[in-house]
Amino acid sequence: MNFKKEVALGIPKELPNKKIYDPNVNHAPIRENVLTREEKILALRNALRYFDKKFHKELIPEFKSELEKFGRIYMYRFRPDYKMYARPIEDYPHNSKEAAGIMLMIQNNLDKRVAQHPHELITYGGNGAVFQNWAQYLLTMRYLSEMTDEQTLVMYSGHPMGLFPSSKNAPRVVVTNGMVIPNYSKKSDLEKFNALGVSQYGQMTAGSYMYIGPQGIVHGTTITVLNAFRKINKNPKGKIFLTSGLGGMSGAQPKAGNISECITICAEVNIKAIETRHSQNWVDEVIDDTEKLVERVKNAQKNKEIVSIAYHGNIVDVWESFYENNITVDIGSDQTSLHNPWSGGYYPVGYSFEEANKLIYENPKKFKSEVKLSLKRHVEIVNKHVKRGTYFFDYGNAFLLEASKAEADILKKDGSFKYPSYVQDIMGPMCFDYGFGPFRWVCSSCKQEDLDITDTIACEVLEKLALSAPEDTKQQMMDNIQWIKAAKENELVVGSKARILYADSNGRIEIAKAFNKAIKEGKIGPIILGRDHHDVSGTDSPYRETSNIYDGSQFTADMAIQNVIGDSFRGATWVSIHNGGGVGWGEVINGGFGMLIDGSEKSEINIESMLFWDVNNGIARRNWARNKGAINQISRAMQKNPKLKVTLPNLVEDKLLENI
């Protein structure tokens, strides 16, 4: 059977052969068995409803075995035999070009070069899922191949609820992930609901079909590292950036360090993750001995090298070794998946990767205890380095939050954290308040020449806009022009032919309009526009994206909800809203979109309407929180567009409130 026919078939009419568990693939950690006997029966009943009754007797013991062995029912048997990667848009069976674009994006999220745990449908972050099981994937692809531009596919946490009549102006797909009643949003609730097969953690771009490989975060990481060095007034050359994690998102750190021209040391316990990044040229060297690492780093400091080193082992050992050997760490952070601390997101010091994974399911209580002890030790050594002059920041992975829960020495006397989130110090005031965020695009032709043309177009647009840019955004413009000029040389593409670029509202709109013109003229194929959820307007997250909101509203989620609703009727091809993402389940509400543009007048209208809202909604909220940069930026936006009317805050003098 050829690819198109297999996709259009969906769940096969006859049972495919069982799949052999492939030890060469990076698999998800075994999840804790949290279900009672009655709940296990319910999980099996839930899984079996995808299949004809005649197969139930054969599938029950198989699914029961998966549930007991892995803590989840993945339905490995139904993983398709065809290769999983982003194909040219015309290769997908379709009645709707927009639906074909979504199929391309889904397959990219599950490409083994891109996805962290492809056979468990996990794209990044340890538990960031596209689907809960392979039946959901097959059924979704079938619906997408059938649908027209007058239908909308509704996705409930990976489950395709069905095609519903809509209109050409409606989204083709509406995605929700992990939407639960607030009182049932604890991490233990997620484990139970996910094991039952009724909810999932979509992270950000995993469950919304907008992941573009580690490139998706490397630009933001580069901006963060560059501005961190600027903040401490140090030239990056010969200076150290110490961090951890080489997974789907964290794997961007060594590449970003090289682009920033510093010495990057990134610890990772999973050798497969290291091998993946090393083979992709995202990290230069691999060392598994702290003595050798110390020697190598001292030489790199002496020679002011630009080099990235993966240390195979625990980050705590590196911090302690550097302290003992008087190695100055200029910038420090952490990007382990601490949003998921009990299921392999963070590995305790003193255990090998294999030992820790075994402990997760054999003795989860002890594993949790060891993680907490490790976090205490981690914080203790970071505190010592900070006293020596290290600038340490939380990289939005819940490090500060989980360390505080572990009762580590991470709080000031007033109960606030000792260290800032990178959004508080860098990304918020320098980027988000001005509307700069991770705009991205994917060439649906999958041609390198199309990507090259879009790079050139984007650069030309930015250079033109930079000529009239206000002083408070000129540095951001210049950083992004330099980024796009060096993008191809830096070999950023893993998976689909995609690019990320931090741009403000005006930049995103003008770049997209220039793409649309090039499509109309036949220079390039259709383009899929999108962004990370980690952006100006898309995410309410008090420990990350909205951590530089100080009016008390950082714990509210009106912005993210308003954003996805607004995107849905302004021209988005698909929209998504998730519980969790970045900092973790119950801590965040975040959303995103995808928009296929095809050179048409309709695409032009959608670009101007939706991209304007998608950025300025967040600037308006940040302005109301009294953020100076956002007040300036939204005022400029109102001058440019007379239809925009935003409420500006009246600032009260501090002395008037001193005696209250």
Q: Where do the PLM segments sit?
A:
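Long, compositionally biased, glycine/small-hydrophobic-enriched stretches that function as flexible linkers
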Residues: 1-195, 199-210, 364-514, 518-530, ...
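Short, solvent-exposed amphipathic alpha-helical segments in soluble enzyme
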Residues: 258-260, 323-327, 408-412, 519, ...
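Catalytic or ion-translocation cores adjacent to nucleophile or general acid/base/metal-coordination motifs
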Residues: 202-226, 230, 236-240, 246-303, ...
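Glycine-rich beta-alpha junction loops
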Residues: 271, 313-316, 335-340, 396-402, ...
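Active-site/ligand-binding-proximal alpha/beta "capping" segment
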Residues: 308-336, 343
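Short catalytic-loop micro-motif centered on adjacent basic/acidic residues
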Residues: 240-243, 306-311, 393
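Solvent-exposed alpha-helices and their adjacent loops that cap or buttress functional pockets
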Residues: 146-148, 164-168, 183-184, 232-236, ...
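Residue-level detector of anion-binding/catalytic polar loops
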Residues: 263, 328, 391
